[in-house]
């Protein structure tokens, strides 16, 4: 989201922040224009990047899909973790069931075919938004809480459409900002531009999805939030505050320490923990400290997810990723 903005599948949503001041129509169950996310979730063959509904979730050589378990520790690791909260616990901000009136997690919609209506969205930050149009299905899965994110994958062209603060009133969609991503491309947002996330990054590639856990392997970094950020580093493109010593920037990558013993956790949680060791977590938005993002799914076991609450900042370390960069305007890695 942009500097003026924000602290800020199954087909449902996240509970977050405070309610928006503008009234919003309560999302209803997706109509036939939305294909079941569970039915279309695909797990890529070994060596490939993540995939969804026969579309890649960015190329295999994208920074989101790159392991960081052998990279050096970032020189600011200790300071950043102290700033966020070394002894503060993690929280998996997704699950099954509902909370505060809506399902728990960030939803995504999968659409395709001529029946999908494309909408011109009226943005209140148009200077950093992609004009569209946006293929928004009737009654889309939308994030509950204050951010009202809508995420849509169009299988016709394998493009990802993301909107922040989406509101539908009087037959017209409006929003704070919007971004369109070619899922076959490593191109980043223009430098200093927001997206539907404060870091100027896409949201979908960082979501934990139940089908990945079911398949036994997650091959991408995971989105998370903290309260205070300053500046931004590659691959992020946007900041909510100017750089400050010791305050983590948008785009910072962290990983679970290699010696953290995961053997006592249930197998499903070990899949998530291995991903945190191998691919790490990416700071993408302002929110509660150490809140980890995922897509809602009735198959999640919330009690099991709460076992990960025992993770603390002290179990992680920041990673130096700049050596992987090929071009500052690309997510491609060496």
What are these regions (language model features)?
Residues 2-9:
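Sec-dependent signal peptide recognition
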Residues 9-11, 41:
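Low-complexity proline/serine/threonine-rich segments in eukaryotic and viral proteins
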Residues 14-16:
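C-terminal motif of bacterial Sec signal peptides marking the signal peptidase cleavage site
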Residues 18-20:
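Bacterial signal peptide processing site
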């Amino acid at each position: 989201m942009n500097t003026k903005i924000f602290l800020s599948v199954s087909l449902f949503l996240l509970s977050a922040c405070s309610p928006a001041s503008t009234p919003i129509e309560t999302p209803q169950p997706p109509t036939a224009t939305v294909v079941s996310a569970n039915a279309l979730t695909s797990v890529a063959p070994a060596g490939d990047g993540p995939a969804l509904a026969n579309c890649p979730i960015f190329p295999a050589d994208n920074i989101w899909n790159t392991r960081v378990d052998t990279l050096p520790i970032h020189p600011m690791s200790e300071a950043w973790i102290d700033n966020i909260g070394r002894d503060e616990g993690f929280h998996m901000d997704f699950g099954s069931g509902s909370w505060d009136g809506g399902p728990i997690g960030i939803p995504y919609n999968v659409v395709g075919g001529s029946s999908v209506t494309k909408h011109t969205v009226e943005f209140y930050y148009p200077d950093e938004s992609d004009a569209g149009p946006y293929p928004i299905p009737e009654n889309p899965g939308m994030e509950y809480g204050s951010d009202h994110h809508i995420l849509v994958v169009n299988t016709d062209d394998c493009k990802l459409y993301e909107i922040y603060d989406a509101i539908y009133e009087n037959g017209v969609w409006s929003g704070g900002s919007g971004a369109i991503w070619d899922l076959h491309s490593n191109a980043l947002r223009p430098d200093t531009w927001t997206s539907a996330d404060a870091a100027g990054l896409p949201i979908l590639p960082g979501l934990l999805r139940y089908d990945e856990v079911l398949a036994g392997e997650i091959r991408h970094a995971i989105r998370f939030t903290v309260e205070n950020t300053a500046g931004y580093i590659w691959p992020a493109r946007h900041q909510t505050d100017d750089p400050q010593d010791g305050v983590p920037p948008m785009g910072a990558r962290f990983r679970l320490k290699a010696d953290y013993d995961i053997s006592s956790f249930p197998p499903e949680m070990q899949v998530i923990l291995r991903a945190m060791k191998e691919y790490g977590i990416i700071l993408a938005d302002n929110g509660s400290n150490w809140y980890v993002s995922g897509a809602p799914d009735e198959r999640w076991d919330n009690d099991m997810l709460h076992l990960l609450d025992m993770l603390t900042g002290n179990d992680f370390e920041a990673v130096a990723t700049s050596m992987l960069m090929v071009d500052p305007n690309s997510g491609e890695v060496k």
